[in-house]
Amino acid sequence: YLYDDLWECDKVEYALNTTNFFICKILPVPFAKCCTMGTAGQWKAIMMAWSYENGLAIPKAENSGAFTGGLSRLLRVGFVDNVIKLDYNSLYPSIILTWYISSGLDISNSMVSMLEYVLTQREKYKDLKGEAGAKAKKIKKLLETFEGSEEERRNLKIEQQAWEAEASANDKKQLPLKILANSFFGSFGAPNVFPFGDLICAEKTTCVGRMS
């Protein structure tokens, strides 16, 4: 019974906590802490570790304040058909990188480089997810008109499931990186929580976003 319990716990952990373990690999905190801390806390831990390793002082926390946010308009109330949704891929992180929105508090210019690393890693796993998903769909379409033996069909089905599992695994890896990258802007706008926060940088990010 003990082996069964351990096996079940291992599978549940693998399904639900893989992403936390993945993020914890780049955080200077214990795994248990990584599972419970917020994303602003994660960026704080990364930057504090960087500062200590490079002999840099930690900026003094500042009070938070209001700034102009994203553009929002309600043009019509009620049921609306023929609606099209357009979504930018990591809008705010992309704006920060494109326009190099960097705080003067970051004297080593490390924050933007770290954000670029996170986004680059995310795109890598997104590409792997897409490749695996495409292969799974190709096999699925092949099975619709497949006229081979039952053993060949069974082997193709196993291969399809393997590619689907690969796509799912890479999706789970890209998602926490997406969340971490998107929270970079939130950290900018919370200098009371994130010592490297900068309201001017946060407002410049939303300003460019409104004009995009």
Language model regions located:
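Common nucleic-acid-contacting/processivity interface regions adjacent to the catalytic cores
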Residues: 1-97, 150, 158-212
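Extended, charge-enriched "interface" segments that sit outside catalytic cores
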Residues: 124-134, 139-163
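Metal-dependent catalytic core segments for phosphate chemistry
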Residues: 91-140, 178, 182, 186-187, ...
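Short, charged/polar low-complexity linear motifs in solvent-exposed/disordered segments
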Residues: 28, 110-112, 144
